[in-house]
Amino acid sequence: WSSDVCSSDLMKIHEYQAKEIFSKYGIPVERHTLCRTAAGVLAAYRRMGTDRVVIKAQVLTGGRGKAGGVKLVNNTEDAYQETKNILGMSIKGLPVNQVLVSEAVDIAAEYYVSYTIDRNTRSVVLMMSASGGMDIEEVARQTPEKIIRYSINPFIGLPDYLARRFAFSLFPQMEQAGKMAAILQELYKIFVENDASLVEVNPLALTKKGTLMAIDAKIVFDDNALYRHPEVHALFDPTEEEKVEADAKDKGFSYVHMDGNIGCMVNGAGLAMATMDMIKLYGGQPANFLDIGGSSNPVKVIEAMKLLLQDEKVKVVLINIFGGITRCDDVAMGLLQAFEQINSNVPVIVRLTGTNEHIGRELLRNYSRFQIATTMKEAALMALKA
């Protein structure tokens, strides 16, 4: 679950924005234009004067190709129709409002290159593979030997001799290795100078003309460092989900949206992780990570419940509270007050343990809306059956 939960500390940008940054650092990218209408796509197609273009949905998620959000076209009629289709679709719940029209490139080979943080070695790690254009996680799972990894010493960085050594592991020819070394150095600069958490090119294409070109571009930033990079922060294009997460943060919650239908309200990140694991263990899918913290204020419970029920996919709510600083009777009072303000028929499973747990349970026991559980396992099973 760590990648899902930690995503609240990361800022993603669109492919077209990442390519603009690549261009500033001298990394070759294909000609492209951002468009928001089918008419705009046709105009861009004609301006490029090329036979083929690729139309790519611009949304802050992966899997665009599998969802039908990436299309190669070779005439204006297809370009117009495919753009209409893409602009009308939703990918992983995110509406597509803009597309990137790119010149189609004749590709001889595809490679994968990325820089990210390896928390085990506490260093930046360079990952490369000759199996580019594919899901790199799938490559790592099925054929891990195809991925080359190098840890970067932060005191040394990536001087010429190291860049060339790494480049030769993919390109034995001197000319191509030289081009690759330069790209590796510039990607590393992007990573370090912008406080990125991930810089990825997939694929990095070797064209039939012998040039190396970033066909796709992805950059993820650590939002804890954005105060140092106002120009990066200006690129932020929040999705509706991220707006909800930002609103939750303002209210003092840790909230991350997920794809399931069991809403979770928990106090403490560790208990939240354990609750989600328990739900998964018995075949359920959490709809969110929501940590209300250690406050004993019923108002926070009211706000948290409103936040959970904004998600139309939530079919049941599981509340798992360990009363230490948080008093279980205050949580119960907050729940009663919340449903005086909220018109919802969603069933609510409540597990209260710790400070004033018996008082909290008694407050809720007379209301059929609430189903009381005494253990985390019981709560998870009740949520699945609700």
Each language-model region and where it sits:
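Short, small-residue-biased leader/transition segments that mark boundaries at the very start
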Residues: 1-7
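Catalytic core of bacterial c-di-GMP phosphodiesterases, primarily the EAL and HD-GYP domains
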Residues: 324
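Short internal beta-strands
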Residues: 345-354
